[in-house]
UniProtKB/Swiss-Prot annotation:
Positions that bind Mg(2+) 1: 217, 221
Listed cofactors: Mg(2+)
Species this protein is from: Serratia proteamaculans (strain 568)
Positions with a binding annotation for NADP(+): 45-48, 68, 76, 78, 108-110, 158
Name the record gives this protein: Ketol-acid reductoisomerase (NADP(+))
Gene name of the record: ilvC
Keyword Zinc-finger (UniProt): no
Chain residues that bind Mg(2+) 2: 217, 389, 393
Amino acid sequence: MANYFNTLNLRQQLAQLGKCRFMAREEFADEAGYLKGKKVVIVGCGAQGLNQGLNMRDSGLDVAYALRKEAIDEKRPSWRKATENGFKVGTYEDLIPQADLVVNLTPDKQHTSVVRAVQPLMKDGAALGYSHGFNIVEVGEQVRKDITVVMVAPKCPGTEVREEYKRGFGVPTLIAVHPENDPKGEGMAIAKAWAAATGGHRAGVLESSFVAEVKSDLMGEQTILCGMLQAGSLLCFDKLVAEGTDPAYAEKLIQFGWETITEALKQGGITLMMDRLSNPAKLRAYALSEQLKGIMAPLFQKHMDDIISGAFSGGMMADWAEDDVKLLNWREETGKSAFENAPQFEGKISEQEYFDHGVLMVAMVKAGVELAFETMVDAGIIEESAYYESLHELPLIANTIARKRLYEMNVVISDTAEYGNYLFANAAVPLLKEFMTTLQAGDLGKSVAGTSVDNAQLRDVNEAVRNHPIESVGRKLRGYMTDMKRIAVAG
């Protein structure tokens, strides 16, 4: 199979990369109505599979789970989760032929085998759903022409999808219809109903494309969302310990610092995050972030280029064919890092101390978010999509580090995200080694000394932060998410 994106001409590529429209709430007046009375069968019962299914059932849809026969016979975790929650469970052969919508929520690397197994069983005119378009765009999966192919991609982990729904809210969501598979013109109606059934319409839905979702999702998770947090954690911990900081304190400052810092980001963007610093610290964080952007821009651009060309997906799929030898080696190396094995700090670190002693971490977040956003937009991705794949998801990923350090982050994210994370972090750490030697007292582990501030410089920095394009689009999109809750687990 050929990479679908690479079969398109330039005009088609640009059109699909640039497809992005914020949908009005009135467009979801029928909510999940289009799918009521129809049979929805979910393949896969992981975090997204289970939690989307629970939401859809609570929205009045008929939901069942199709699992492999061996998973049922051996009563594997997927079978237990589905049955313990009262869902009907059956084999592919039992359930797929009656399904009006088959939702594939298995891991990326299983998509090809799953889709090839279910396609022959699907009835004429049924629909096939994804929550990530990798199989369609990067693998180039060919789907029967009578089948409608749609995507509903919540911009949060599965657990958050469920928790927000139970609060009567939802999470921001991208929806799309594959242009090669919409024979009856009902793809958008199906996608809208599915998104509403998960609660996404209450938080904001972007009409996107499979191409835009995949290329932006890969870029975000590889760079700022996971790769930058991993590289930053390793670099900052080693720097603190090398300068005599108690390893336990250093570990806690970093483990919970990302979450505390990005909670401000979630509530008020980069502007609020920077406003949590003293004026001297803000000026220093801005200067550091500009240095970081200059150093890292080529690395961000290389990742975007490799994602657009298909070089990234080709390399990762080659590793799949070798039983994940690279992925597993990188995972083992991360587990052996000093940060992952540092003792726990029993003392208290106040919320403000995370900012005061984490000026470099604030700078890393600012630089990473802006670079990811700018690089995606330069590649033709619309600003709203770039926002969701950079700034919006960052607090959720930081929250996983607060739970069990980098191990937890890499367990929670997909194997695709984990592979890309290691690629980026393994390049970023040596790239930033020299920069780390230039840090001043007060950049990390201590507060910035001095109180002198140049008014004109502070004015210019404030204006530069607030006028960055990601802040403009962020203010608009956060307006649709006013019911957000704090996700901090607090250290």
